[in-house]
Amino acid sequence: MSFAQRLRKFRFDWPQRVAAVLLLLLLVQCYWVARHQTLTERDYEYARCGREMWEKPSPLAGYFTSCGNIHDGTLAYRAAGLPLTVERIFAGASSQNSPWELRHQLTYVLLLMRLPFVFCGLCLGAALWWVTRRLFGNEGGFVALSLYCFSPEIVRACTYPNPEILATFGFFAAVYTAIGVAHAMQGPRRKWRPRIVLLTAAFGFTAAAHVLAALLAFLFALGFMVYLAERRRAALIPVMLYSAIGTLLLLFASYAFRPDAFSYVFRSGAARMWFSFAPAKTFFSAMPNAGVTLAAGIALLLFATVRRSRYFGNLAALLIALALVPIVTTGVPGEPWLWALPFLLTFVGGVFADALETPQRKVFLAATAAVLLLQAALCVASLPGLAR
């Protein structure tokens, strides 16, 4: 089926409209927070280093940018600097000038820098809805997306320059693309290639955001593909080999094909990690996240007691969430608990969708609505704190 045929088959019915409204509400929250923020030294660092990556090499010998060697991924810097570079090009200004230099007069500079991160957050929400709707139906998709769009931590991650929302999107996309590749391997070979290319792009995106996220995503993807490929397991070796080579090439490209800068990926300790439940405890005990915490607790209880909830779609998401939650990065700053959040919401959406198909549907429907309304109210109430 050609792309044009697929486009003609696309329908924007009520499920898509509800999802679009939820994503629009997330966009409104991000816009409100960004409008009430002020520019910081972190913004300046990301803007300056990002512009240098796009426009000119560092004047300092042996360094990729004037910020020094980038040890926590280039993608966030490039994302923050790209809108400023594009604006300068369209304005016809010299590369020595930028809207950043007029940041005190131009109020939209802060919004420009946050656009790529907000866009990535919206893409992650769309991917979460698409996956959960495919796996669990409309109800599972709406539960997961509602909790996502009214998660204060998602709004926070979308409204300042950082690699975490980028790594979270890449991680989620890589794992479920790998599952899709494993399913496609049961069919004709002509359907493999586009999915393998997409898988490579997802791994490359994740690696450019955070090396540890890419390594963990690769391990989970390999494990699920070995489990699902069945009679095609022998073909996994070349598939994963091509994906790994393509990922390294994309990561090399993110360093502008400069070997010295690229070598720092292997010398910076960016993939070092340890285990601690402190970040997860902070997240689940915070009042603005009470709705997510309550939903996760209910989902775990139902998963343990209701047999119909224990199948691959729910179990896979739960395993990844449980594996990521206790991980902490020791080499560079990172938030693996945030990488786990979309998988946790996928699990919640799946279990709630199963509960809504039982004879006690009305009771579960009322409980689900109460949890979602609680989380939405808490998220909106927390927005002023996020803007500070």
Predicted regions and their residues:
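Short acidic/glycine- and proline-prone juxtamembrane loop motifs at membrane-interface regions
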Residues: L39-E41, E153-L166, P333-W337
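Transmembrane-helix signature of polytopic, membrane-embedded enzymes
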Residues: Q16-A20, G92-W100, L128-F150, R190, ...
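Extracytosolic helix-loop segments that constitute the early lumenal/periplasmic catalytic or substrate-binding loops
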Residues: Y44-W100, M185
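Perimembrane helix-loop-helix junctions
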Residues: S2-K9, G180-Q186, L215-T247, F303, ...
